[in-house]
């Protein structure tokens, strides 16, 4: 069975094609085909990159007049040109989409219907950057592939069973009745990493108490017990929680009232500042990219040093806040761009917990230390670095839904 996965963002579109012969393996396979569109490098143009498992590559820049047309152009390289891996589109059995916000009603992956599309559009007010991009991908597939089955895999679904004490904000109860509650995000990544941790540790997932740290441009933690998310740092939107690349994370809401009343801020300006001009970028004045922050620190830049210190401080605080809900910890997991590649962040974070005997093996804590345990043998918890593979998790959900549907 060939499964196409689309992972749409506001500025990029990533896709890959998997082939699953039987039950999906525990080890993620290499995709037959991988494609990416990036709209950020030059205004009015999209950069397309494609590679296949046989080594064929394509790089091109095209006019970006219509995002759906660009997505269709990318997907057509599956059966056209040097990167062709299938003869015709109908060889693909199902298309899976990462959908950022599924609200309270979508607690698991579902086949996409008109009703599901309407819900994704309605929930765009909760995720205005991502849900519209997810819909673009869905509609591009409809245009290109016709009535092929499509599956929505929701980033919020893994957190759908948060205890009410963790899900409800301490405002008027009417907020909760209106859907204003904590949803959590990065759920596909948190779930994948929890399952992969159980494999690496040779333990049953239901026996593990885990904290997963998804640290990329967006950052969130999840406390996982019995394979279920019981606490997470993102909330109603992906702005809550940890300091991020360009997002502030949690701040005193009184600051926002002050800015609205006394600094002439509009809601749109607040949105721009909190989402695009804060976090590592806002404090350092340099970049949202931790690699550039590290370079500036090495050059003696004090604001870059302060930005990293705040980042670590808030990360340590969030990890500490998760511990009482788990009643202990079996493994701490680092994943995503920063989590997987920054040995500095991992070491600095765990240094705050040395009094609990969380010990990193410095020889194992290398930048490319993926899918391995980097804790010392006598550490009280295992410290894992896992390469998150959201696309493979989406493909697995598609396979499972197709199998279930065929048996019903």
Swiss-Prot record:
EC number: 2.7.2.1
GO MF term set: acetate kinase activity; ATP binding; magnesium ion binding
Cellular location(s): Cytoplasm
One of the record's GO cellular component terms: cytoplasm
Pathway: Metabolic intermediate biosynthesis; acetyl-CoA biosynthesis; acetyl-CoA from acetate: step 1/2
Signal sequence, renumbered to the chain: none
Residues at which substrate binds: 98
Coiled-coil regions listed: none
One Pfam family it belongs to: Acetate_kinase
Keyword ATP-binding: yes
A biological-process GO annotation: acetyl-CoA biosynthetic process
Family per similarity comment: Belongs to the acetokinase family.
Entry protein name: Acetate kinase
Native source species: Cyanothece sp. (strain PCC 7425 / ATCC 29141)
């Amino acid at each position: 069975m060939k499964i196409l996965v689309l992972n749409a963002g506001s500025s990029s579109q990533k896709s890959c094609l998997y082939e699953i012969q039987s039950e999906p393996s525990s080890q993620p396979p290499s995709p037959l085909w991988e494609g990416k569109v990036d709209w950020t490098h030059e205004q009015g143009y999209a950069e397309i990159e494609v590679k296949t498992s046989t080594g064929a590559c394509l790089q091109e820049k095209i006019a970006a007049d219509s995002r759906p047309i660009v997505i269709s152009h990318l997907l057509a390289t599956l059966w056209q040109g040097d990167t062709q891996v299938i003869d015709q589109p109908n060889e693909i059995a199902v298309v899976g989409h990462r959908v950022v916000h599924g609200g309270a009603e979508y607690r698991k992956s579902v086949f996409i219907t008109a009703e599901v599309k309407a819900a994704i559009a309605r929930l765009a007010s909760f995720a205005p950057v991502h849900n519209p991009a997810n819909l673009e991908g869905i509609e591009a597939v409809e245009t290109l592939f016709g009535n092929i089955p499509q599956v929505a895999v929701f980033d919020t679904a893994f957190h759908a069973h948060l205890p009410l004490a963790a899900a409800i904000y301490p405002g008027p109860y009417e907020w909760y009745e209106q859907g204003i509650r904590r949803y959590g995000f990065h759920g596909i990544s948190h779930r994948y990493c929890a399952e992969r941790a159980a494999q690496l540790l040779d333990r049953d997932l239901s026996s593990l108490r885990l904290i997963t740290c998804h640290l990329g441009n967006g950052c969130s933690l999840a406390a996982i017990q019995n394979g279920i998310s019981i606490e997470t740092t993102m909330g109603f939107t992906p702005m809550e929680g940890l300091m991020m690349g360009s997002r502030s994370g949690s701040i005193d809401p009184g600051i926002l009232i002050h800015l609205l009343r006394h600094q002439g801020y509009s809601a749109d300006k607040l949105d721009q500042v909190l989402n695009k001009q804060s976090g590592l970028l806002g404090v350092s004045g340099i970049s949202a990219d931790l690699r550039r922050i590290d370079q500036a620190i090495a050059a003696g830049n004090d604001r870059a040093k302060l930005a990293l210190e705040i980042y670590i401080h808030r990360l340590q605080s969030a990890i500490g806040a998760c511990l009482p809900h788990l009643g202990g910890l079996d493994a701490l997991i680092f994943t995503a761009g920063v989590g997987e590649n920054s040995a500095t962040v991992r070491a600095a974070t765990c240094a705050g917990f040395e009094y609990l005997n969380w010990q990193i093996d410095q020889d194992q804590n290398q930048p490319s230390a993926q899918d391995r345990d980097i804790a010392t043998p006598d550490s009280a918890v295992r410290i894992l670095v896992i390469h998150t593979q959201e696309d493979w998790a989406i493909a697995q959900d598609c396979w499972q839904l197709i199998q279930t549907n065929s048996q019903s």
